[in-house]
């Protein structure tokens, strides 16, 4: 990993969602979440590290009482291809029993990660599981679930920015970009 590799990735990408569109989407999602579970005192779980940026943008707009925690699991490990192995690094530390749980993630790609989270949260006794993602990728194959709240639908390309990375780089971008070449 080095600066030149990061710049090479950026040079072989294009912006597909502007920063203004991202911000407007965050406000829209917050309004929908508030209308649905604003009175439920939900437990909000952020999936680290991809959801860090999305979570930081969304939480200030959720102007109702909630509890916050994070979980950490991965399928990608700084590559552009998902692995079938789910690796849990941090499970929920707050009790989910009899709670409405809202899980925040950067992107719902094939849906395997969110489905694994859903299954574990429900097995732990949650009353209701919900998910919010900044992006859902359009795929030809069926997914095990779709998010309850979604900012954007993106094409079946490798996307990054707003918390999503390309080989570990560019999570910090305020826009969403897509690779234009297979690198």
Language-model features: where?
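PRPP-associated nucleotide enzymes
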Residues: 1-183
């Amino acid at each position: 990993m080095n600066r030149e590799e990061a710049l090479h990735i950026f040079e072989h990408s294009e912006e597909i969602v502007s920063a203004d569109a991202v911000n407007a989407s965050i406000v829209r999602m917050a309004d929908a979440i508030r209308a649905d579970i604003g009175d439920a005192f939900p437990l909000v779980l952020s999936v680290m590290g991809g959801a860090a940026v999305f979570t930081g943008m969304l939480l200030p707009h959720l102007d109702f009482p909630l509890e916050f925690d994070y979980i950490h699991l991965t399928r990608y490990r700084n590559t552009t291809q998902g692995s079938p192995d789910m690796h849990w690094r941090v499970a929920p530390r707050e009790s989910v029993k009899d709670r409405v749980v809202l899980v925040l993630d950067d992107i719902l790609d094939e849906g395997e990660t969110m489905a694994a989270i859903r299954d574990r949260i429900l097995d732990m006794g949650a009353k209701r599981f919900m998910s919010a993602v900044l992006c859902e990728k359009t795929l030809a194959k069926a997914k095990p679930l779709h998010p309850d709240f979604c900012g954007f639908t993106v094409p079946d390309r490798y996307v990054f920015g707003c918390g999503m990375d390309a080989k570990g780089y560019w999570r910090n971008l305020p826009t969403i970009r897509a690779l234009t070449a297979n690198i």
